[in-house]
């Protein structure tokens, strides 16, 4: 998709704050500091539309980005961030679960994992949750440029096995540096919009 117009419409915490729209939505889920903001910026060809932070846990709301009057990316808080209180993490969990299970406009979830590391229990639980609710999902393994190409397949196998990955789902190696995987991710989105 050729992206020229992107706008952050609202940062929401409750359903009544979600934008009233019929446009399809794609949620981006992943651990804190896994590269969600870099993924968004790469997909929409912007350097800093989604703020990138060295501090995990920066996103604390559901951020609705309208793209080309055609769809929304919804950046959800990173899960598994230890430096916020348990109460705060539980609030984020409820906010994410409410959005994912009740939003009619949601067409799919882009689950982002770090190719360099074995997925955590939180990653596994998120994937299992999406499968349980029969929500279309693509797993995007970011930061491929940070490890030697010779390790890509080995690391991808570890990610798939740890998640108990469904071979019917799409799995993409991604790099915000080289733009590898960008076209495959857009293909998943386009298919869900048809």
From Swiss-Prot:
GO biological process, one term: division septum assembly
SUPFAM superfamilies: P-loop containing nucleoside triphosphate hydrolases
Binding site for GTP: 30-37, 57-61, 75-78, 142-145, 174-176
Cysteine disulfide partners in this protein: none
Family matches, as Gene3D superfamilies: P-loop containing nucleotide triphosphate hydrolases
Cofactor: Mg(2+)
InterPro entries: G_ENGB_dom (IPR030393), GTP-bd (IPR006073), GTP-bd_ribosome_bio_YsxC (IPR019987), P-loop_NTPase (IPR027417)
GO cellular component, one term: cytosol
Alphabetical UniProt keywords: Cell cycle, Cell division, GTP-binding, Magnesium, Metal-binding, Nucleotide-binding, Septation
Pfam family, one: MMR_HSR1
Molecular function per GO: GTP binding; metal ion binding
Summary of the function given for this chain in its UniProt record: Necessary for normal cell division and for the maintenance of normal septation.
Protein name in UniProt: Probable GTP-binding protein EngB
Species lineage: Bacteria, Bacillati, Bacillota, Bacilli, Bacillales
